[in-house]
Amino acid sequence: MIPVRGLEGRKVAVLGLGRSGLATARALEAGGAEPLLWDDSPEARAKAEGQGFTVTDLTRDRAFEGVALLVTSPGIPHLYPAPNPVIARAMAAGVPVDNDIGLFFRSFATRDWDAFDQMPRVVCVTGSNGKSTTTALIHHILSEAGRPTQMAGNIGRGVLDLDPARDGEVVVLELSSYQTDLARALTPDVAVFTNLSPDHLDRHGGMGGYFAAKRRLFAEGGPDRAVIGVDEPEGLYLAGQLSVAPEDDRVIRISSGQKLERFGWSVFARKGFLAEWRKGRQMASIDLRAMPGLPGAHNHQNACAAYAACRTLGLAPRQIEAALASFAGLPHRSQTVGEKGGVRFVNDSKATNVDSAAKALQAFPKIRWIAGGLGKDGGIVALQPHLGSVVKAYLIGHSARDFALQIGATDHEICETMERAVARAAEEAQPGEVVLLAPAAASFDQYPNFEKRGEDFMEKVKALL
């Protein structure tokens, strides 16, 4: 646990009692604060009381008298589409609002600098797609190289549940826009921006607000080194804003398709090979085609980001290459479930938006595509240029009929359920084809989350193998 510093003897309100909320309460208590907990759910409140915490109704009048800070869980809106009433009440009372990420940065190793021979460092990864894989890959590479490391944030443990800092340790955090948007302190040593595509726009008031939330990680006084994906306009802009000149090697530009040889430091992938260039010289080349856990151009971008971050931490190219080869990938992200009769079944349930689905569709030459769910703003019209590899689409969920109208002349069948979609795709697939779940939609019409959707797909596939 990371005890929260600087709030000793103060009352701190905690809103939202899921994993991060309860971890925050424990860390506040360990640091000497007095946490006051609230959640709209009676079950969550009862669980907190059962663990010995004080539950206080933060919706009542004058609830914030004497309260020094409100700490809120990332899923609770503080501005758009409308502030949560408790957060609005805190703001009206002049009480500052933070989250567990902000508390982590104000507390991690801050009183122990003289205890370390080699300072602990923090790497943060944000972006629309590839965050989890990049975070897990950095952690895996560091572990394989023998470096002490922990992983947390939007993946793994809550940040305040981490163990206290060790000498020379690297903490790798995946941060969503919900987490970066509200944190009052964001001071990573290395920050990674993978890419940007429309997502969570209702929570940020539009694309500009969404980008602004991600960009906070790179604010003045932020990272010593920035790793920026420049395959979209926002990444190009961010890299330019952070650089004093093209040769500035404090910014490492990465790409999964462009040559970036003219910059001070760059890492890019083309035709299956990763190349590192620094000050006009090629420093390394790695063949990514044989890496089983990193199929497709989108995973090559993840590999470039992880490689660049680990190079800034002092790892050698060959150390990184060996670790890339042993990376198994993450569940529900280009995950091979099995193969039968020359047909491969791939679970990419995490492809919940158009951009991530497009990258999944580019990874294989002949695809039986299972798509659908709860569609997002704009539908999937933007996927039309990427449908050349799709032999047939099998559409499920709430958006099935809308998707059928948006995929043009692509052969398709409305299946409604995962069970029928898997059965029909498996029945019609030919040797050399891939049955791919890449929904391009949220899961909430039929499943509680994308993980459960992916598990259902895998269960149906394994029954056929």
UniProtKB/Swiss-Prot annotation:
Family annotation (InterPro entries): Mur-like_cat_sf, Mur_ligase_C, Mur_ligase_C_dom_sf, Mur_ligase_cen, MurD
Annotated coiled-coil segments of the chain: none
Record family assignment: Belongs to the MurCDEF family.
Provenance organism: Cereibacter sphaeroides (strain KD131 / KCTC 12085)
Protein name: UDP-N-acetylmuramoylalanine--D-glutamate ligase
Gene3D superfamilies for the chain: Mur ligase, C-terminal domain, Mur-like, catalytic domain, NAD(P)-binding Rossmann-like Domain
UniProt main location, coarse: cytoplasm
Enzyme class: ligase
Residues engaged in binding ATP: G127, S128, N129, G130, K131, S132, T133
